């Protein structure tokens, strides 16, 4: 299968044995899709259905927890907010899905500038593309429907299809298994959240790029384990085809 070489690689690296990349796993909100505050509003509306309303200390604590948990499965986030009450957590997650789905219906969603072209470049070079989300499968499908992206990717994986969501490696490993990747090092991951970066690291991907179009700054992405930091996912095809030493492309 055609592939994109890692920085400095021509086919298999004779020194390290690193194979070329044949699969790219990208995050969605903040990585390939602009947020525009929709996720935070949906969380705010969802926890309000459980009596946690703006202007209260409980609301401030809950939203701080939401911000720390970006990239994680929405149900896992709700369980962390309502740890002693699973029915409340599940009800809040369903409310999140309704709220975010309604927001898509009202305003749609927009791709990060250059993201669509990046996906086209990757697939045009023979690399398979999987999008990975912290949304439920239903909400994720609504996002892809709104963007018209089903024909731009090879696979979409949601955490309700896997044993665990990010930061566990299950989403990335599931993509590898479903798309027949023989070696975990054939995979590159691009994520805008700490949870997503950790998932890529734990899955053994050879490139784990942090992306700065989300809400997480450079330093936190690096501490989470990013091997590279990109200003945008639009820089990812160039990173994977670079012939010189690996370098950050932030801000380019």
Task: Enumerate the predicted regions with their spans.
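Conserved Lys-Pro-Asp/Glu-containing loop-to-beta segment of HAD-superfamily phosphomonoesterases
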Residues: 166-195
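Conserved SAM-binding loop
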Residues: 32, 111, 129, 189-190, ...
């Amino acid at each position: 299968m055609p592939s994109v070489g890692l920085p400095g690689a021509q086919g298999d690296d004779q020194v390290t044995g690193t194979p070329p990349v044949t699969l790219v796993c990208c995050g969605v909100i903040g990585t390939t899709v602009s947020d525009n505050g929709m996720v935070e509003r949906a969380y705010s509306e969802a926890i309000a259905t459980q009596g946690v309303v703006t202007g209260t200390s409980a609301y401030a604590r809950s939203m701080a927890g939401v911000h720390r948990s970006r990239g994680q499965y929405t149900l896992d986030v709700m369980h962390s907010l309502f740890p002693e009450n699973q029915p409340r957590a599940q009800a809040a997650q369903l409310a999140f899905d309704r709220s975010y789905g309604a927001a898509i219906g009202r305003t749609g969603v927009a791709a990060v500038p250059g993201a669509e072209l990046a996906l086209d470049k990757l697939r045009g070079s023979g690399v398979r593309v999987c999008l990975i989300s912290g949304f439920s499968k239903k909400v994720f499908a609504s996002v892809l429907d709104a963007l018209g992206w089903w024909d731009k990717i090879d696979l979409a994986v949601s955490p309700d299809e896997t044993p665990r969501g990010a930061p566990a490696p299950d989403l990335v490993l599931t993509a590898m298994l479903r798309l027949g990747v023989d070696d975990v090092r054939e995979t590159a991951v691009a994520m805008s959240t700490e949870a997503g970066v950790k998932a890529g690291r734990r899955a053994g991907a050879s490139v784990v790029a942090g992306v700065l179009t989300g809400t997480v700054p450079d330093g936190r992405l690096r501490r989470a384990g990013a091997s590279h930091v990109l200003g945008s996912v639009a820089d990812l095809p160039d990173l994977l085809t670079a012939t010189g030493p690996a370098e950050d492309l932030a801000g380019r």
